[in-house]
């Protein structure tokens, strides 16, 4: 099948690799190179790099909502468009531009976690089950019919990297299966029950509320690493917690109290034992190395 591929981050790479092997990728659309590093060099997206290596034409328009881009897509000889974490809303004119429309890989149990950050919200909310869906896109926000779906059981302390890697590779396999049977698949409409929205994360959400349970804070730490990071402030410095453990211990301390010299912190329920953290503008350190340079005393109440 002749395919136009739209995607940007590492999450989309396994699918593009599979499409290159099994189908004919006619064009790739990805976000424009972004300034990176101290020298502010222009870094191509992972998808741009992969397409370049395989000599596939690459386009990086600033928007899909203009006649120039729509006309370009109409001119590409393709049967279908595959969209994964592209970063732009796809207008109706493009959704309907090809015979089989636009397919999307969405890593959640739709209609739960529609939106921009399903992987992060799955972890932050402590979900122990999820899914990967192949969806035919429509004009709504992740409201399209489901062509194929596979459920996942999640480990209680799964990290964002682990979940992303698992869903990316499963999604690639499911998409290839979908394309092989696309003329025979009966689309399934999404339920109107259980709809939630996985809104894009904000930096403000990363601030830790010590009155939450230790487990809830641990979920936030795992779901927000690397960005925006779950953080607290100490001596007017922002400190991100990169890794921690939660302990279901009863206690009588005010939430936010440091109860040991190993940075164990009382929460609304339970204790959070910090194991890796990073002060703003400094490198990440394990707890022992961090405490050698920043002494957070027992009985300190963190804000």
Swiss-Prot record:
GO cellular component: cytosol
Enzyme class: transferase
Sites where the protein binds (6S)-5,6,7,8-tetrahydrofolate: 108-111
Its EC number(s): 2.1.2.9
InterPro entries: Fmt, Formyl_trans_C, Formyl_transf_N, Formyl_transf_N_sf, Formyl_transferase-like_C_sf, Met-tRNA-FMT_C, Met-tRNA-FMT_N
Domain of life: Bacteria
HAMAP family: Formyl_trans (MF_00182)
Name of the protein this chain belongs to: Methionyl-tRNA formyltransferase
One GO MF term attached to the UniProt entry: methionyl-tRNA formyltransferase activity
Record key words, sorted: Protein biosynthesis, Transferase
Entry-linked PANTHER family: METHIONYL-TRNA FORMYLTRANSFERASE (PTHR11138), METHIONYL-TRNA FORMYLTRANSFERASE, MITOCHONDRIAL (PTHR11138:SF5)
Catalytic activity: L-methionyl-tRNA(fMet) + (6R)-10-formyltetrahydrofolate = N-formyl-L-methionyl-tRNA(fMet) + (6S)-5,6,7,8-tetrahydrofolate + H(+)
């Amino acid at each position: 099948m002749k395919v136009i591929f739209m995607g940007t981050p590492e999450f989309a790479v396994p699918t593009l690799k599979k499409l290159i092997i099994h189908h004919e990728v006619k064009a790739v659309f990805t976000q424009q190179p972004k300034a990176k590093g101290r020298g502010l060099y222009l870094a191509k997206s992972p998808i741009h790099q992969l397409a370049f290596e395989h000599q596939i034409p690459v386009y990086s328009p600033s928007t899909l909502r203009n006649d120039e881009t729509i006309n370009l897509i109409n001119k590409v000889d393709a049967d279908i468009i595959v969209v994964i974490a592209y970063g732009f809303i796809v207008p109706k004119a493009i959704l309907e531009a090809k015979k089989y429309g636009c397919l999307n890989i969405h890593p959640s149990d739709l209609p739960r976690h529609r939106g921009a950050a399903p992987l992060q919200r799955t972890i932050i909310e402590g979900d122990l089950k999820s899914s990967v869906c192949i969806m035919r896109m429509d004009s709504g926000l992740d409201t399209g019919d489901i062509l194929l779906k596979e459920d996942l059981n999640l480990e209680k302390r799964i990290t964002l990297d682990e979940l992303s890697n698992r869903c990316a590779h499963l999604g690639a396999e499911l998409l290839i299966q979908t394309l092989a049977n696309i003329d025979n698949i009966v689309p399934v409409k999404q339920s109107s029950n259980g709809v939630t929205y996985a809104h894009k994360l904000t930096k403000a959400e990363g601030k830790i509320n010590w009155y939450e349970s230790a487990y809830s804070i641990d979920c936030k730490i795992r779901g927000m690493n690397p960005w925006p990071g779950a953080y607290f402030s100490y001596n007017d410095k922002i400190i991100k917690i990169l890794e921690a453990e939660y302990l279901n211990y009863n206690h009588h301390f005010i939430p936010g109290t440091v109860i040991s010299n190993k940075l164990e912190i009382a929460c609304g329920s339970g204790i959070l034992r910090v194991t890796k953290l990073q002060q703003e503008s400094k490198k990440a350190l394990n707890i022992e190395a961090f405490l050698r340079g920043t002494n957070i005393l027992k009985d300190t109440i963190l804000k």
